[in-house]
């Protein structure tokens, strides 16, 4: 469970499905407002370390955004206290002026003062909607980028001499799926297929840098080698080269 303060009046609490289960809740509980849900919200607020701006009394509104694997709860603090204090409404006239006002005039003045106080709440809600929209766009972009990420990479290395190729093969200790050896235009080309799915994002670049200490990186694609090159070893080329000498 994570909490993020978006503004002075808004918090975002993110809970995983496991967080909900641990507290006896499920996503369906948020679909229909009920006393259990409200009690759960306030229990979460007690559990978390609240910012000072949320510690004073005031009405809190809760907005729930369910996701497939989590729930985002936006907590907005109203600037109108639950127990409205006329002293907080600075636009109200003093007692002498109140005595001269008709009931209709008093109600209109009171409504104006409250409207001014709730302006910040409306702006907070609008800001919250913008934050939600941006976060949804960011999450969608991250999901699309993740879906486009290839779990495998073919590295293609070029060697001028067979001896250099064999020497490189003997340095290989990283895991690979397979490797191929081609010859084209009097040069040797080694393709190495590596599974990067369970590795951190910098791993492919780190691995290439390590390979380039012993070999030249090639711009020639594997499809070109397959079409125009001579296949010397169609699989496990590195393992076979390691056996030489």
Curated annotation (Swiss-Prot):
GO molecular function, one term: protein-macromolecule adaptor activity
Subunit structure: Homodimer.
Known role: Enables the recognition and targeting of unfolded and aggregated proteins to the ClpC protease or to other proteins involved in proteolysis.
HAMAP family (alphabetical): MecA (MF_01124)
Similarity-based family: Belongs to the MecA family.
Domain free text: The N-terminal domain probably binds unfolded/aggregated proteins; the C-terminal domain interacts with ClpC.
Name of the protein: Adapter protein MecA
Species name: Streptococcus pneumoniae (strain Hungary19A-6)
């Amino acid at each position: 469970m994570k909490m993020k303060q978006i503004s002075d009046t808004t918090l975002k609490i993110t809970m995983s499905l496991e967080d909900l289960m641990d507290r006896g809740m499920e996503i369906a509980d948020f679909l229909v407002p009920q006393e259990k849900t409200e009690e759960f919200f306030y229990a979460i607020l007690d559990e978390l370390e609240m910012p000072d701006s949320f510690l004073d009394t005031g009405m809190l509104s809760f907005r729930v955004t369910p996701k497939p694997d989590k729930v985002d709860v936006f907590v907005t603090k109203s600037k109108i206290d639950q127990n409205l204090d006329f002293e907080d409404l600075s636009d109200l006239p003093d007692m002498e002026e109140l005595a001269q006002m008709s009931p209709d005039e008093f109600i209109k003045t009171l409504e104006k003062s409250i409207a001014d106080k709730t302006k910040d709440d409306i702006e907070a809600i609008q800001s919250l909607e913008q934050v939600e929209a941006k976060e949804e766009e960011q999450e969608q972009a991250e999901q699309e980028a993740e879906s486009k990420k290839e779990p495998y990479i073919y590295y293609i290395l070029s060697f001028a001499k067979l001896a250099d190729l064999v020497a490189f093969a003997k340095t290989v200790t990283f895991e690979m799926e397979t490797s191929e050896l081609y010859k084209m235009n009097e040069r040797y080309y080694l393709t190495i297929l590596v599974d990067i799915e369970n590795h951190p994002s910098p791993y492919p670049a780190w691995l290439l840098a390590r390979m380039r200490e012993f070999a030249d990186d090639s711009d020639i694609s594997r499809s070109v080698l397959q079409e125009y090159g001579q296949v010397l070893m169609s699989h496990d080329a590195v393992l076979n080269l390691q056996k030489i000498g």
